[in-house]
Regions:
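Acidic, metal-coordinating catalytic segment for phosphate/diphosphate chemistry
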Residues: 1-24, 93-94
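Short connector loops at helix/strand junctions that flank enzyme active sites
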Residues: 11-13, 38, 96-101
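Short, acidic/hydrophobic/Gly-rich beta-strand patch recurrent on exposed beta strands
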Residues: 33-36
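Unchanged
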Residues: 48-140
Length: 156
């Protein structure tokens, strides 16, 4: 059972930025997946379960929210990106806490249909940084991922 949340609570979560590679250049992404909530875009992510690592959480949540199996995803070594932000839920009572989300990079060979279980839809976006999607969460992640891919392409 989870402890009651307070404004000082930090809730750990993990997610995955899922990309496909450009057929002509395997060092650069071609597309990336975002999930559609009613009023915003998001990535597959969720809270860590007891005894679960952040990577295990990211892979489990991606499978639960997209239907894409961990067996179909290759994690990209050397990248993680964390951010913290305040969250307030007003139902049934007001609860505030800090969410800390750690994102990892994973690739699959081709963009594919996604089974939406917790979202209204999805889209495979063209990788064309800089991106301007959601300034507080998604844009910083995509900026960090773009810098990572650039460093990796220079070192290969």
């Amino acid at each position: 059972m989870r402890e009651p949340l307070s404004p000082h609570s930090i809730v750990e979560a993990a997610g995955l930025l899922l990309v496909t590679y450009d057929d002509n250049d395997k060092s650069r992404p071609d597309q990336f997946l975002l999930m559609r909530h009613r009023d915003r875009w998001d990535l597959p992510k969720g809270h860590c379960e007891a005894g679960e690592s952040l990577v295990e959480t990211a892979l489990r949540e991606t499978h639960e929210e997209t239907g894409i199996s961990a067996d179909d995803i290759s994690l990209i070594a050397g990248f993680s990106f964390s951010l913290q932000y305040p969250v307030t839920y007003a139902s049934p009572q007001v609860v505030s806490f800090t969410k800390k989300v750690t994102y990892f990079l994973g690739w699959i060979t081709t963009a594919r249909p996604v089974r939406c279980t917790e979202h209204e839809g999805y889209e495979w976006f063209k990788w064309s940084p800089p991106h301007s999607i959601q300034v507080e969460t998604i844009d910083p992640l995509l900026t960090a991922a773009a810098a990572f891919f650039e460093r990796e392409s220079r070192s290969s």
